[in-house]
Amino acid sequence: MLQRCGMGFGMVGLAGLLADEGRLAAQESDSAPDPSAPKRSHFQGRAKHVVHLFMNGGPSQVDTFDPKPKLDEYHGKPLPSSNLRTERKTGAAMRSPFQFAKYGQSGIEVSELFAKTASHIDDIAVIRSMHAEVPNHEPSLMLMNCGDGRQPRPSFGAWVNYGLGTENRNLPGFIVMCPGGYPIVATQNWRSSFLPGACQGTYLDSNHTDIDKLIANIRNTKLTLEEQRRQLDLVKKLNELHAEERQHAPLLEARIQSFELAYRMQSEAAEAFDLNREPQHIRDLYGSGTHGRQLLITRRLIERGVRFIQIWSGAGQPWDNHDGLQTQHLKLATDWDGPIAAFLTDLKQRGLFDETLILWGGEFGRTPVAELPGLSGRDHNHYGFSCWLAGGGVKGGVVHGATDEFGFQAVENPVHVHDLHATMLHLLGFDHERLTYRYAGRDFRLTDVSGKIVREVIA
């Protein structure tokens, strides 16, 4: 089934082209023309591309972008009010082991963990009043990625792919990179659900440096391109006959398109992912680490018209530091900080920054109090956390919203995940209430029945 294409480039490969055509069930309706074709947004958007830097596991806001001096005063003591209920038992206040400093003309305070990123703070809008719904990874990941933590819904990238189409038909419009395997709930994070299957994310394991492994199985080495073309034309005719008999079958249509995409990718994919084509000084700028490679690939994909690129910190939930937070956050942030700064610099130098909307953050934050019994980590915190936006029409050098004096709960200008999505869609040129898809008798949208634009972060 086409939904399995979200498993990676290999799942859109040509090697097994004829193996399972007869298994495709005609169970959907409302087929449409090529869903990847370029489309106009509701109005002129500021951004053409989205890059989502996902710190999966939940980074601590009070150790990164939300300084709380009160935690120093109360370190090792109970908070004046009772701790909010989270997933696990928590105890006394826990100060940040990291120093904050003011950066840029805006003077926004950022932790030393992201000192290099903070050199761009005048181009960044920090939202310190994010909030979600529950302190659990799975529903919070679904909410951040799909706009609903309970029901299967299309991912944000799928909505963008559906709404705008792709600028390059030789590459997927939505690419997901996660080094070392899948994050929690795996391909559900980038699914298309009831949207056309061609809109879903295409996954690759960015731990691989060998191109043939990174984008495996898009070639059938047993056939020439001409033979593949003839085979593909035959399969397309058979699929079209199958579709005619059943009137409407969007998954089948998407499957046809996925075969076509795999064929076209043979001419461009290897070149797009080949970092040896970059000059040495650019490779040095990004560094040799995994996140540097991912972000350099991302810049190359943006140049080639890919709409939505999502980059994960790693398999599982790397930022989920219930203990050993100081050591783990330091390692994780160090791996990200330099490459993020390099990426922002590179985009600006190439004139891509203003058309690329960048989101940094996790599915939730962490408590300002220590988790019991270890006292060296923090529990999940959905009541108040931070993210930041940059590029693509974002007003830089601003802080929006605030948590309480300890960083536990959003208290000033709270921003729900639906509000974040509405704002990002607006920057892409969409009225979030009008970007809908009819399914099961009702119109669905990414922001469900809520969401308001955070205009304070828009330039």
Predicted regions and their residues:
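Ligand-binding pockets and gating/stacking loops
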Residues: 1-459
